[in-house]
Amino acid sequence: MSEITIDSFSQEAFEDPLLLLEELKRMGQLADSSREAKSVEQQTEEDIVSTNSEEQYKQFIDEVSDMKKSFSYKPILIKAMMEYADVNGRASMSDIIDYYLNYFQTRADQGKVVEKAESTFVQHFGDRKAARRTILIYPYKRFEMKGMMKFDKASDQIEIVPPIWDNISNKIRRVVASYCDAQLLRYYEKLETT
């Protein structure tokens, strides 16, 4: 079986976030099947670490592609992380809060629906303290419970855990951000018609 890498994806995959996420999932499935071909005795500690890393990455991609959302918060957090995370997958809360506030301010400036009326970002528009509390309670907590993100109080940063972040190339960052854009577009279309 020939190895599939992100460089072997079709150009169409890079133009269609849904298609690219399917390709990424297929990559994960191929890695799973090649690993299963090894007997338990043949698996090394490196294989086991790799399995855990690949499995966490696959779960992250699955979560991104099938994000359940009551509000727009999760895709915005992922977009902020894709934009501001450093080489270690960490982004400051200040940058993340700025991203949220700028996102909602831009929607307001364009005369678009900002969020549901009960949203913190509507009720406390522009309030950094309320934004911080909401980000840490809702979208972040969901990813933390799944072992995908951590929050470091000392540095005031959210981190995408290394087993996931180490598998995210710049191309994948762009694809994930594009996919979040598509999810936000669908979310707001639905919100504006209800």
Where in the sequence are the language-model features?
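Intrinsically disordered, charged low-complexity linkers and terminal tails
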Residues: M1-T194
